[in-house]
Amino acid sequence: YFDSYFFYQNRDFLSKLPFNFGGIISLERNYYGLGTKFTKNINYENRNKTLVLGVDHLNQSDDRKRFKNNFGIKGENTLDQLEKFITTGIYIVNQASYSSGLNVRYGIRYEINNIGFDSSNMINLDKLNPSLGLSYSLNSTDNIFFSFGTSFETPTLNELSNNPNGTGFNKDLKSNNSSNYEIGWRKAFASIAFEAVAYITTSDNEILPYEIEEFAGKNFYRNVGSTFRRGFELNSQLFFKAGRLNLSYTLSKNQFKNFVIDGDDLSDKLIPGIPSQMLEIDLIFKLSRKRTLILSNRLIGERYADNLNETLIGSYNIFNIKYSKEVLRNSEFSIGAN
């Protein structure tokens, strides 16, 4: 069978930043996408097979203007360009489920990206990404799994348009290429479920923000060589009569590799802005068929604010409470405090 989609979005955006040159941004975005996929299910004596073939096409056009920010008053125009981001991807995925409890999933995707602000200032970025996933059911409650895949992340139009030399398009910014490895275990009962996952991610040309003195408060972007991330994630759900409890914990170490900037060797330094630990707890009460209460707490651990790891930002908590009630059959009223 075939499954297709189409969407269109329009955004009109105005922002004021705390600096003069280019400090007022006007953006009108037109974004649409379409795609289709063909799925075929085949049943054999000892396995079930699913084959998926698909194609996607996305087109984003940003009419971006910048003006001088004269203490909140729009001044002279400093940038006026129509930016384009066009993506086309084709993919194939094959999945087989065996009666022994083994599941195998593998696929490949080829993607072409055309990015720029006119026909003479376009760059082409393409990538072939394979993936492989294996899982095995040990019994009715336990499942182990492994996955490998590569990923390809292009710079966004916002990242490309913020160029320190003022030309409005940073052709030196490259795509981020990553390899991801994951191994884990799941256990599920009627009222409780656990999942534990260990992962390793290596990347080249990772894109990170930075600031320069002339434009304090404005982010520019650059590639940082390579990075190495590893971590452990634990997720659990407890179901009870009146609702459920969700728990999620992440422990990670995210480091630069082979990265020298302004004469400083940042190899083995921690990537700034990423906490080493995070804990999320959600308590969801179903007060009645139409009323729900959600209590959630998020603990963000310590992280560094700079590449040299000289400034440490302390941990903090975010607590949210939300109450919602269905007022009509297809509408809901909610109120919350953060």
Can you say where each PLM-predicted feature lies in the sequence?
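Residue-level signature of outer-membrane beta-barrel architecture
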Residues: 40-42, 86, 92-100, 126, ...
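Face-selective signature of the C-terminal outer-membrane beta-barrel domain
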Residues: 1-121, 137, 192-200, 239, ...
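Surface-exposed extracellular loop regions of Gram-negative outer-membrane beta-barrel proteins
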Residues: 59-70, 112-116, 122, 136, ...
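Outer-membrane beta-barrel channels and translocator barrels
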Residues: 43-46, 99-103, 139-141, 178, ...
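Hydrophobic, lipid-facing positions within transmembrane beta-strands of outer-membrane proteins
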Residues: 30-36, 86-92, 128-132, 144, ...
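Gram-negative outer-membrane beta-barrel transporters
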Residues: 38, 198-202, 220-306
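C-terminal beta-signal and adjacent terminal beta-strands/loops
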Residues: 204, 299-306, 325-338
